[in-house]
Amino acid sequence: GPVILYEYFNCENLSSHLNLIDEIRPAITWDYFSNGDQASLELKKWINEVLDLSKKYFKSKKIAIDVLNGPAVTDLNKNGIEVVDAKSILEQARVIKSPDEIICMKAAIDVAEIGISKMRSELRPGMTEDELWSILHKTNIEYGGEWIECRILSSGQRTNPWMQESSNKVIQYGEMVGFDTDMVGPYGYCADISRSFVVDNKFNEEQKKLYSIAMEQIDYNSKLIKNGMAFEEFVEKSWVLPQEYYPNRYSV
């Protein structure tokens, strides 16, 4: 069937240049923030819109949606439309990258690496974590990027356990600074890169040990990768984390 885009009201011109869009319609929102006590009336309009699509294009009474709130699901069910989770469908489709997508991904990664390089060159004792973190944001916007999903940057004792957010903590000489870019860069593609620096590159013995372990893991796993390898096989053969680091391991 056709690709129909629901755009902001009176903003159809924003997407009129997209050649993959067959039709543009005004979006209908039924959330309370936008509509107050009229939200239920807007929801009925949206339900009627879906029913119109179902009569014209649906081959079954099922619709796959990735995110939808409770009242909409309930009303669709009442009107004979079964809602199924679209996540598995969308994620499997996203596994296959077109040549254009690969170019966009490389562009986003390039911008992230420029930002990382600037962060490393400007890192100095006395600046706050937030000051350092702002460099990545500025670089991303400067090169046509969009936004950053998280604030995962920490220094010194705050780096372990992981996942602490950037703060106004002052970075000290010799501390380790770690971060995840979590950056939605140019063309809306994500560049999620993890990096760790030591302020002024003066490693103590513990930092040298951690660096060596990290390099061992990267080198070991890199040598495993080959064309046609399944993720399951890679996981089974991949480097095993030493037991002493297991309690504070990354959750993924």
Which sequence ranges carry the predicted segments?
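Active-site neighborhoods and metal-handling regions in enzymes and metal-associated proteins
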Residues: 1-252
